[in-house]
């Protein structure tokens, strides 16, 4: 466990992760029942989704109404949080981006009472809460990427982390630009024209991701890697993800 993850775990004890209402009735047996003896207690019904255990299908309801529903047990009510961390090389430039990603994982893990937080490379659990943490420095189509993540999800949160120099580069000087993913090098003058063109491209790129997020009812949160921890928690609270413990 990294130092940033440990700090996130510590800070998460003072806040609570807010579970979206639409995620409260679609868990998949990921957490233990709140008290002994409740593990098989019936709680509610929900619509069948591909991947559900057919043994939980209520055949009586199907016969009466032609509706496919599954029985939800008491221990299945709390949702799974699937956490997706960008592992690409660009997240290490600067290291603060990776550290913020690690901090968020620890923070959510600690703050999400009654949930099981699991790190994934691909979505697996139907009706899970899915959190994507990335700098989004990719040419991939945002709608295609979010369609894959949002499929059968209860809700999706996209958290973009940029360094201060990526979000607002300073003009002046020149240097060698190195692509952290490919190793490609290019001499670049950071004059007003170049920086203006970069900011225009970044704005358009951001708009594409925000529009895709709206289409799939996903939340989009922007963070600066160098921000103090208090500011990070404040941004997540403003996005409806966290609240202080009472």
List the model feature ranges, each with a label.
Residues 1-34, 126, 146-246:
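Von Willebrand factor type A / integrin I
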Residues 142-144:
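A short acidic (Asp/Glu
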